[in-house]
Amino acid sequence: MGWWIFEFKKESKSMFVGVLFLLTLLVWTSESLNSDGQFLLELKNRGFQDSLNRLHNWNGIDETPCNWIGVNCSSQGSSSSSNSLVVTSLDLSSMNLSGIVSPSIGGLVNLVYLNLAYNALTGDIPREIGNCSKLEVMFLNNNQFGGSIPVEINKLSQLRSFNICNNKLSGPLPEEIGDLYNLEELVAYTNNLTGPLPRSLGNLNKLTTFRAGQNDFSGNIPTEIGKCLNLKLLGLAQNFISGELPKEIGMLVKLQEVILWQNKFSGFIPKDIGNLTSLETLALYGNSLVGPIPSEIGNMKSLKKLYLYQNQLNGTIPKELGKLSKVMEIDFSENLLSGEIPVELSKISELRLLYLFQNKLTGIIPNELSKLRNLAKLDLSINSLTGPIPPGFQNLTSMRQLQLFHNSLSGVIPQGLGLYSPLWVVDFSENQLSGKIPPFICQQSNLILLNLGSNRIFGNIPPGVLRCKSLLQLRVVGNRLTGQFPTELCKLVNLSAIELDQNRFSGPLPPEIGTCQKLQRLHLAANQFSSNLPNEISKLSNLVTFNVSSNSLTGPIPSEIANCKMLQRLDLSRNSFIGSLPPELGSLHQLEILRLSENRFSGNIPFTIGNLTHLTELQMGGNLFSGSIPPQLGLLSSLQIAMNLSYNDFSGEIPPEIGNLHLLMYLSLNNNHLSGEIPTTFENLSSLLGCNFSYNNLTGQLPHTQIFQNMTLTSFLGNKGLCGGHLRSCDPSHSSWPHISSLKAGSARRGRIIIIVSSVIGGISLLLIAIVVHFLRNPVEPTAPYVHDKEPFFQESDIYFVPKERFTVKDILEATKGFHDSYIVGRGACGTVYKAVMPSGKTIAVKKLESNREGNNNNSNNTDNSFRAEILTLGKIRHRNIVRLYSFCYHQGSNSNLLLYEYMSRGSLGELLHGGKSHSMDWPTRFAIALGAAEGLAYLHHDCKPRIIHRDIKSNNILIDENFEAHVGDFGLAKVIDMPLSKSVSAVAGSYGYIAPEYAYTMKVTEKCDIYSFGVVLLELLTGKAPVQPLEQGGDLATWTRNHIRDHSLTSEILDPYLTKVEDDVILNHMITVTKIAVLCTKSSPSDRPTMREVVLMLIESGERAGKVIVSTTCSDLPPPAPP
C-alpha cells in the first residue's frame, strides 16, 4: 500500500475529508486480503522485478490470491469458504522475473509446490524457506542464485524433488541434506559447489536421481552412497572427485545411468560394477583409471552405452562383453589396451559405434565383426593390427565411417566395399595394403574423404571414384597407381584436394585440369608425368598449393600461371623445364614457397621476383640461370628458410642488398662464376646458420661476424682470393703457405721426405680433381635444407636452429631424479612435462617424448614426428605470447627426445579456470589473458614465415606465467599451412569440445579451426564452464552458448558468477561485448569467422572503449606462486 502526502489549506476541509475516505477504503481492502496474499504481495513488491508485468493481476483488492497468475489454492479443513483457502502451489517459471526472493516466502507455510525456474533471480536462497515445511517440490533451477545452500532446508522433511541446477551457488552441499528422508530427486549440476560430498547422502534411501555434475566437488565418493538403494541416475561429471570408485556402487542395482566422466578418479574399475544389471549408460571417460576392464561388465545386460575412453586402462578387452546384447556404442579409445580384438564382440547385434583407436591392440581384425549389421562407425586406427581387412565389411549396410589408418594391415582391400554401405569417411592410410582401389567405394554417393596413402595399391583410379560427386578430398599418396591423370576428377564440383604424389602416373597433364574450379591442393610429385604444363592451369583460381616436383615435365612455365592469385606454394623442382622465368611470377603476391631447382631454366632471374614479399623459401639451384643476381632479391624480407642459387652460371658481384635478409637461415651461392668480395652487409645476416660460396671467383676478406669466421674451409673452396677466418691470413707477412726457398734441397734424407710428401699430395690432388669433375657433371643436392618428396620428413636438415642454452642431459637427470613421477607437472598430447631446477637456479620445463629410433617401421615414427613438429615450429618463433623453447636433445638412456621450455609458474589456463582457482581471476586479468593468447595465435597465423596452424588450441595449452601473461604452447600437432611434407594427422586434430564442426566432414584443418577453438577458450574465460557440456545441454560449450542466447537472449546471466559480482556497468558491458566476439569466432560456417588478426583488433577496441576500468587487480591480490 502506497503513502500519499498532500498539502492543503484550512479552508479545504472538504477535500481533506474525501482523501481521508479514500485512504480508509484502501486500508480496509488491503486488510481484507488473507495472509497468504499479503506474503505474496511482499514477494512481488519487495523482491521480484517484473519488467514485463507478468504479475499484473496481483493486487490487494482481492479477498484471496487464488486467482492470481501462477497461484493455486486448496481448502484447509472441511469448510470451502474463502477463509479456508490457502496457497499450496506457486508456479512463476519462465516469467522473466529478476530481483531476489524475499524472506516473506517463509510465510507460505502450506506451500507444497514451488517453481521459480527459468528466470533471472539473484541473491541468496532465503533461509526462511525452511518454514515451508509442507514443501514437496522446489524448482529453483536456471536462475542466478548465489551464496550457499541454506542448512535450514533440513526442515523440509516432505521434500521429494529439489532442483537448483544452472545457478551460481557456492560452498558445500550441506551435511543437513541427509535429513531429507523423502527426497527422490536432487539436481544441482552446473553451479560452483565445492568440498567433498557429504556422507549423509547415505540417509536418502528414497533417492532415485542425484545429478551434481559441472561443479567443483573434490574428495572421494563416500562409501555411504551404497545405501541409496533406489538410485537410478548418478551424475557427477566434470568435477574434481578423486580416489577409487567405491565398490559400494555395485550395491545400487536399480542404477540406470552412471555419469562420472572428466574427474580425477584413479585405481581400478571395481568388479562389483557388474552387479548393475539395470544400467544403460556407463560413462567413465576422461579420468586416470588403470588396470584391466573388468570382465564382470559383461553381466550388465541392460547396458546401451559404454564409454571408457581417455583413461590408462590396460590388459585385454574381455570377451565377456559379447554378452551385452543391447549395447549400441562402445568407446575404449585412447587407452593402453593390448591383445586381440575379441570375436565375441560380433554377438552385440545392436552395436552402432565401436571406437578402439589409439591403443596397443595386435592380431587381426576378426571377420566376425561383419555380422554387426547396425555398425555405422568403426575406428581401429593407431594400433598394431595385422592381416587383411575382413571381406565381410563390404556387406555392412549401415557403415558410414571406417577408419583403420596407422596399422600394419595387409592384403587386398575388399573390392565390394561401398557397394551396400553409405560410406562418407574411409581412411586406410599408413598400412601395407595391396590390390586395387575398390570400384564401388562411392556407390552410395556419400563419400567425402578417401585416404589410401602410404600403401601398396596398384592399378588405375576406378570410374566409381572419378564419378563420386560428394568427394572433397582424394588422397592416394605413396602407392603404385598407374595411368594418366584422370580428367574425370575435374568434373567433381566439390573436390578441393587431389593428392597423387609418389605413384607411377604418366603422360601429359591434360588441359581439362583447368576445370577443377574448387581445387585448393594439387599434388602430383614423384610420378612420371611428361610434356608441358597446360596453360589452363591458370583457371584454378582457388589453388593454394601446386606440387609437380620429380616428374619429367618439359617446356617453359606458362605466364598464365600468374592468374592463380591464391597460390602459396609452387614446387616445379626436379623436372626438365626450360626457358626463362616469366616476369609474371612476381605478381603471385601470396607465394611463400618457390622451388624451381634441378631444371634447365636459363636467362636472367626477372627482377619482379623481388615483389614476392611473403616468400620464405627460394630454391633455384641446379639450373642454367646466367647474368647477375638481381639486387631486387634483397626485397624478399620474409625469406627465412633458404635462398639457393647454387649450380648455375651467375656472374658479377654478389649484390649487397642480400644483406637485408635478416631472417635468412641458409644461403647457397656455390658453383657459379661470381666475383668480387663478399659484401660487408652480410654482417647483418644475424639469423644465418649456414652458407656456401665455394667454386666461384670471390676475393677479399670474409665478413667479421662469428658465423663467417667459424665456417669450415668447404664453404669457400675454389675461391683463391678469399682470406680470413680458417682461410689464409689476409696479411701477406703472416702467410700460412711455406716460402718456396724453404723447400730447396738439403740433406738426402730431407730430400726423400719431400719427394714422398710431394707424391702423396699430388695423388690426393688428382683424386680431388676427379671428384670435383664428377660433381660438376652430376650436381648434388644444395647444402641448404631442401627435403626431397620421396624422403622421409624426419631429417637432420629440418632442424633450423642451434641450441643456445647450456643445459646438459646430466643436469636434467639430476634435476628430475631420473624423471621421477614427483616432478611431473603435466601431461600433453605428445609427452610428459617435468619441472627441473638447473644448477644455475633457473627453473625450466622438460617435455619428454618416448622415441622410436631403434625401429625402422614406418608406423613407429609418430613420436619422432611430434618431436620434429615442435622443434620445427617453436625453434623459429620468438614472441612474448609463445612459449619459448630453450633447447632440445636426445637421451639414449631412456630412448627419449627432450624439449626444454620456459617454465610457467602458474600452470595452464585450464587448471586456473577449472581447478577451483577461477575466483582468483577478475575480469581484467581474464581479458589480458585472452588478448595475449590472441596475439600469440595471430602471430602464428599472420607473421610466422611460413604461417602456422596450431591445431590444438585449448585452455590447457595456454600457459600462464607469474604475472598472469598468456603463452601459447604445446605444438605437438602444429602444422605449417599447406605444407604437404608435414605428417598427415588422420586422427582427430584437436581436443573434444574445441573441434570446429566442419572438421567432421572435411577432415581438413585450417586457420579457421584455430579461431573456432580460440572462441571456445574465450567462452571458458567468460562463463567459467568447461568445453564439454552434458548432452542434454548441447554437448559442448559453443552449442550451449548458442542455445542459451536463443532461449534467454545475451545478458550477464551467461557469465561466470565470480565475474558478475562487480556492479560496474562498464565492465559488464565489456564482458558482453567479448562474448559477442567469442560467438563470432564459433560460428558454424568457417567463412563467417573473423581472422585472428581481426579478433585481436576487436579485443583491443573493446578494451579501449571500456577504458581504465579494465585494469587487473589479480596480480596484486594473489600471492606469488610457490618458489621452485
Curated annotation (Swiss-Prot):
One of its GO terms (molecular function) is protein serine kinase activity. The chain crosses the membrane at residues 753-773. Keywords: ATP-binding, Glycoprotein, Kinase, Leucine-rich repeat, Membrane, Nucleotide-binding, Phosphoprotein, Receptor, Repeat, Serine/threonine-protein kinase, Signal, Transferase, Transmembrane, Transmembrane helix. ATP binds at residues 825-833, 847. Pfam families: LRR_1, LRR_14, LRRNT_2, Pkinase. The modification Phosphothreonine is found at residues 808, 816, 1002. Gene3D superfamilies: Phosphorylase Kinase, domain 1 (3.30.200.20), Ribonuclease Inhibitor (3.80.10.10), Transferase(Phosphotransferase) domain 1 (1.10.510.10). Residues 1-32 form the signal peptide. Its EC number is 2.7.11.1. GO terms for cellular component: membrane. Its main location: membrane. The active site is at residue 952. LRR repeats lie at residues 86-109, 110-132, 134-156, 158-180, 182-205, 206-228, 230-252, 254-277, 278-300, 302-325, 326-348, 350-371, 374-397, 398-420, 422-444, 446-468, 470-491, 494-516, 518-540, 542-564, 566-588, 590-613, 614-636, 638-661, 663-686, 687-709. Belongs to the protein kinase superfamily. Ser/Thr protein kinase family. PANTHER family: LEUCINE RICH REPEAT FAMILY PROTEIN, EXPRESSED (PTHR48053), PROTEIN KINASE DOMAIN-CONTAINING PROTEIN (PTHR48053:SF160). This is Probable leucine-rich repeat receptor-like protein kinase At2g33170.
